[in-house]
Regions:
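Bacterial signal peptide processing site
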Residues: 20-22
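A short, surface-exposed interaction/processing loop segment used at functional sites
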Residues: 96, 209-237
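C-terminal motif of bacterial Sec signal peptides marking the signal peptidase cleavage site
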Residues: 15-18
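Short, non-transmembrane alpha-helical segments in secretory-pathway proteins
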Residues: 134-184
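Structural detector for short beta-strands of small beta-barrel domains
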Residues: 28-60
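Exposed beta-strand-loop-beta-strand "reactive/processing" segments of non-cytosolic proteins
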Residues: 180-216
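Short nucleic-acid-contacting surface segments enriched for D/E, G, S/T with interspersed K/R
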Residues: 79-94
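OB-fold/S1-family single-stranded nucleic acid-binding modules
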Residues: 98-130
Length: 237
């Protein structure tokens, strides 16, 4: 298989949090590494099975982001308007090599992977979780942090994904009991890096009990569990 690794300038294209700068950053595609060669036929179809991560419709090209064997891959998704996939779904896709033009680089043509077709072959844990847990998560944040509606939505989906896939036994008990969950949102510095920190837990009589702290790196779109006994962040797959 030949893949073009598409590098995303990901302040997530959905106008992330910012207290001072409220401009919207968009994903751009940088031709940093390509395994496609210029003689690759544009009519040849490739196929494989991936795990769906998310859609990104905010750049010069719409993207579908997928994962396989702990590696991330992005495909041009300009010819597909279906947005029915949920993170964690297994999908069989077909793609081909075709031309894109890199913005800000003199419109230089490059080969990239274009999605041709996809078929969901298995629901992920998040899709199954949504069918059984019918409560909405509540959330609150500190007023000094300003977040866009798109960022709130993205954080909500991250928390859903975490809850659906978490091995935290206490959290599993609350889900089994259909207990309401909520989370706090704040910004924190750790080791010189800014994270959005989510305090996930339950409330009783106005008092919140935290079950798990989550750290989100918006630049890399990485979610971490906080390991309290060892005071370290553990990447959540």
């Amino acid at each position: 298989m030949r893949f073009l690794k598409l590098t995303l300038s990901i302040v997530l294209g959905i106008s992330l949090w910012s207290c001072k700068d409220k401009t919207t950053s968009k994903n751009t595609i940088s031709p940093t590494k390509t395994l496609a060669n210029n003689n690759t036929s544009k009519t040849k179809l490739f196929s494989d099975v991936f795990e769906f991560v998310n859609y990104n419709d905010d750049g010069d090209y719409r993207l579908i982001n997928l994962r396989k064997n702990n590696e991330s891959f992005s495909f041009i998704n300009d010819k597909n308007d279906d947005r029915s996939l949920v993170r964690g779904d297994k999908v069989a896709i077909e793609w081909k090599m075709d031309t894109i033009h890199i913005a800000g680089d003199g419109e230089t043509p490059e080969l990239a992977e274009w999605l041709v077709s996809f078929k969901k072959i298995k629901e992920g844990k998040l899709a199954r979780f949504r069918k059984t847990y019918k409560l909405d998560f509540k959330y609150h944040w500190y007023n000094e942090n300003e977040y866009s509606d798109g960022y709130f939505k993205h954080l909500y989906e991250l928390v859903e994904y975490y809850v659906a896939n978490s091995k935290n036994e206490l959290l599993k008990l609350h889900i089994a009991d259909n207990s309401p969950l909520e989370y706090s949102i704040e910004q924190q510095e750790r080791d010189g890096k800014t994270y959005t920190v989510l305090g996930l837990g339950t409330s009783f009589e106005g008092r919140m009990t935290k079950i798990q702290w989550l750290y989100y790196d918006a630049e890399k779109d990485d979610l971490y569990e906080y390991d309290l006994p060892n005071d370290k962040l553990v990447l959540f797959p």
